[in-house]
Regions:
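Gly/Trp-centered helix-boundary motif
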Residues: 1-209, 213, 353-368, 372-377, ...
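Alpha-helical transmembrane segments of integral membrane proteins
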Residues: 179-398
Length: 398
């Protein structure tokens, strides 16, 4: 019975949902942008030939996190496009090679601490340059264009106005989404900020789901005193205000993305526990569960292999809202000025829309739109998964 919901045309039924194509398209854009950010938005050229010698300046600026996202994209591509041909041995081989590459990157990569972006811009006028390949957006997220003079808060497609900007020995710069208050390109920062949105949403929700499924499954399966104790624990955690707890930790321990993810995860599991408990209370009386118990199947297998797949429908909807809530929580902190300082964030950029005497519409439209569409697409996916797995909807459609 469990295989019916996890393997039987699940993907085809999910894709048939309303708006799923748009949701997958948007999330795909976010994944590609997050994983290939250094190659999509970078002041340093990707490749140059100077005096018949090849150089890769952009690779000088790569950090460990950049390698992590690149390897993640490669793994996703392999497991998606070759899913029908992958066996267990090949999977372990791919994961082992990926782990080895990450270990080597962590040991040997030593990125530059102080970056002179003007040096990379001047390469364009170097007489020794024979060939150059630049990133589509030739501005890094922390490139504040100091060599151009005062470049703060320029609207999209604005032309340079100050004498220093006009007379500088460089081609006219174009910012499709404008610049922020520090002069950094907004589109470049949005591309790099997609990493925080995806990371905090997925990891925080995964932590919450793992805790909630384990506790909720035990509550629903055993019931009695364990159920009562678990419900009291759920009520305690539901009374904890996540946002105020985040503010407290930021005040005492500084601005740390990993602490944010853990706090959001350990304060958001109660909803998953309630859903899992309700489903397991119903499923534990089913004949196939009783047969599994009589057969002597281990408890772990009964709970998570036979019962969980048949009670996962409410969790998928809750998961979509959980990812959205985690993204909104981080955006709220950044909007309040308590997010990460150096790393770009959508909430941080949204704050700059009203952070001066005038309303900077581009700082509200583009980061705010990114937050809205990301939250909206996760909601669409959750609803589509619910409809694809729900046996009542399947019976009605048939």
């Amino acid at each position: 019975m469990s295989n019916e919901f996890t393997h039987l045309n699940l993907w085809e039924r999910t894709r048939a949902g309303i708006g799923v194509s748009f949701a997958l398209f948007w999330i795909g854009i976010l994944i590609v942008a997050a994983c290939l950010a250094p190659f999509l938005a970078n002041t340093a050229p990707l490749f140059i030939i100077k005096n018949n010698i090849w150089f890769f300046p952009a690779f000088e600026l790569l950090k460990f996190v950049d390698i992590l996202f690149i390897i993640l994209l490669v793994n996703i591509s392999i497991f998606y496009f070759f899913r029908s041909k992958i066996n267990k041995l090949f999977s372990w081989l791919v994961l082992s090679v990926s782990g080895l590459l990450l270990f080597l990157a962590y040991i040997f990569i030593n990125p530059l601490q102080l970056i002179n972006y003007a040096k990379y811009r001047s390469l364009e006028y170097n007489s020794g340059i024979q060939f150059k390949i630049a990133a589509p957006i030739q501005f890094s997220p922390t490139d504040y264009l100091r060599d151009y003079g005062n470049t703060s808060l320029e609207a999209p497609l604005d032309q340079p106005t100050s004498d220093l900007q006009i007379n500088i020995k460089s081609k006219d710069r174009i910012h499709l989404f404008g610049t922020d208050e520090n002069g950094a390109d907004v589109l470049s920062r949005m591309i790099h900020a997609s990493r925080i949105a995806l990371t905090i949403g997925i990891i925080a929700t995964s932590i919450a789901m793992l805790i909630g499924i384990v506790i909720g499954g035990l509550m629903g399966y055993f019931s009695s005193w364990l159920d009562i104790l678990g419900m009291r624990l759920v009520e305690i955690f539901e009374s904890i205000p996540t946002l105020f707890l985040l503010l407290t930790f930021v005040a005492f321990f500084g601005r740390n993305l990993y602490i944010m993810m853990v706090i959001i995860g350990i304060t958001s599991w109660s909803g998953y526990a309630r859903y899992t408990r309700a489903e397991f209370l119903k499923l534990r009386k089913m004949e196939y569960v009783q047969a599994a118990i009589v057969s002597g199947i281990p408890l772990r297998s009964i709970l998570f292999r036979h019962m969980l797949p048949n009670g996962v429908a409410p969790l998928l909807v809750a998961m979509s809202f959980g990812v959205a809530s985690a993204i909104l929580a981080e955006a709220t902190l950044s909007f309040l000025g308590l997010g990460l300082v150096d790393a770009p964030s959508w909430g941080q950029m949204l704050n700059q829309a009203v952070n001066s005497a005038t309303f900077n519409w581009w700082m509200a439209l583009f980061p705010g739109g990114a937050i809205f569409f990301t939250v909206f697409t996760y909601t669409l996916l959750g609803e589509a998964f619910r409809d694809a797995i729900d046996p009542q909807i399947l019976h009605k459609n048939n």
